[in-house]
A protein has these predicted regions:
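Helicase-associated low-complexity regulatory tails and linkers flanking the ATPase motor
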Residues: 128-140, 166
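Conserved C-terminal portion of the radical SAM core fold
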Residues: 177, 197-202, 222-362
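Residues that form generic nucleotide/phosphate-binding pockets
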Residues: 29, 139, 143, 192, ...
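Distinct, well-ordered alpha-helical segments
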Residues: 162-168, 187-193, 251-255
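Core AdoMet radical
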Residues: 91-101, 112-132, 145-160, 171-186, ...
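N-terminal pre-core extensions flanking Radical SAM catalytic domains
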Residues: 1-12, 16-19, 23-129, 141-144, ...
Length: 363
């Protein structure tokens, strides 16, 4: 995985980078810096930076659960075994975030993954030199024809011109997974993606209507619905990537029900707890409110929806029960600060949230 600041990681979930192209060429990072992790994997030892996936897999059997590690095991199962020898490297999958270009500033995002956030906070990033970036691009483009899987994310990948060049160089039978806010379908990148048969759209959404437009700042709910209808006609696979946190503790369920009513299967939903920023963590909610959420989750689990949806519910329930030091006052202060900067009043949008907070603090 490559981020526009130059960091190279095994994948987006990895807890630490392998290196940075500002310091050494990509070829050196992928071979020399990766030897110890390759050795651990070959010897079937747990890799310290992979704990996020191990935690999700703990106590579960089979492959019907959410884990990037399991996803790539399935996705690259046809790769020759000798590829996985220590010291050997053969690029077969990429996750390249060329820039942080994005037209949204989602409340839980930040400058690293959104140029709109960078502009709002007036942050300038230290990025690789033009030559370092060119060398990296050439490495990816030169190996594009042998890739089996390509993950396009961002930022907003449908806005990145580099993705157009990459798509033009890919094998037509490659598997493409694209994580998008689905705000723009009138781009050349979108047109190029539509030409591929094996596309998996991972659409970011976790609530409805005016809550959607607050959380996904810069977005339009009606545009989202129109664009969802467009990709639904393509015959591609569609999943929904959802985060569960302070503001959508109840409305995430309404979002799931709404999308299911549009005909989407229970295996289309990947829901996880928001980890950062911490002030939006769902566990800040008063105990009585969390108990209500837990009851709702347990009720939905009891109906045995199966597939990734049930696994999501179980993960959400487990996360709520993990120890946490509450500070709802800080959460409110941060939301007030955000509202003032953006000229919005969250109290007019999340009325039940503020009502539950006020009630929870008095009992």
């Amino acid at each position: 995985m490559y981020n526009f600041d130059g960091k190279i990681k095994n994948c987006i979930r990895s807890a630490g980078p392998l290196g940075n192209i500002k310091d050494q060429p990509i070829e050196s990072i992928l071979v020399e810096n990766n030897l110890s992790r390759q050795q651990q994997i070959v010897e079937q030892q747990p890799v310290a930076t992979c704990h996020t996936c191990y935690d999700l897999e703990r106590g579960k059997r089979g492959f019907d659960h959410i884990s990037d590690r399991v996803f790539y095991i399935r996705e690259l199962k046809s790769i020759p075994v000798d590829t996985y020898q220590v010291g050997n490297f053969d690029l077969r999958t990429v996750d390249v975030r060329w820039t942080n270009l994005c037209n949204f500033a989602c409340v839980y995002c930040g400058p690293e993954f959104s140029s709109k956030w960078s502009d709002e906070l007036k942050i300038r990033h230290q990025t690789p030199t033009e030559q370092q970036t060119t060398d990296f691009k050439n490495y990816i483009y030169d190996h594009a024809g042998q890739l089996r899987h390509v993950y396009l994310a961002g930022g907003e990948p449908l806005l990145m011109k580099e993705n157009l060049t990459l798509l033009e160089k890919l094998n037509p039978n490659v598997n493409i997974r694209i994580n998008t806010n689905l705000s723009k379908v009138d781009t050349r990148v979108f047109e190029a993606v539509c030409k591929f048969p094996n596309v998996h759209w991972t659409v970011s959404v976790e609530t409805l209507a005016e809550e959607f437009e607050y959380i996904r700042h810069g977005g339009s709910w009606l545009d989202f619905l129109d664009n969802l209808a467009i990709i639904k006609q393509l015959g591609h696979k569609i999943s929904f990537n959802m985060l569960h946190f302070l503001l959508n503790y109840n409305s995430v369920f309404d979002c799931v029900d709404f999308l299911k009513a549009q005909g989407f299967h229970n295996n289309s939903f990947v829901i996880g707890a928001l980890l950062t920023p911490e002030y939006l963590n769902i566990r800040h909610l008063p105990k009585n409110v969390l108990n209500s959420v837990k009851n709702k989750l347990q009720d939905r689990i009891n109906h045995k929806p199966g597939y990734l949806l049930e696994d999501s519910y179980r993960n959400m329930l487990h996360y709520i029960d993990t120890p946490f030091e509450k500070n709802i006052s800080l959460s409110i202060d941060k939301l007030t600060e955000l509202d003032q900067r953006r000229g919005i009043d969250s109290r007019n949008i999340f009325k039940n949230f503020y009502k539950d907070i006020d009630h929870g603090q008095t009992i």
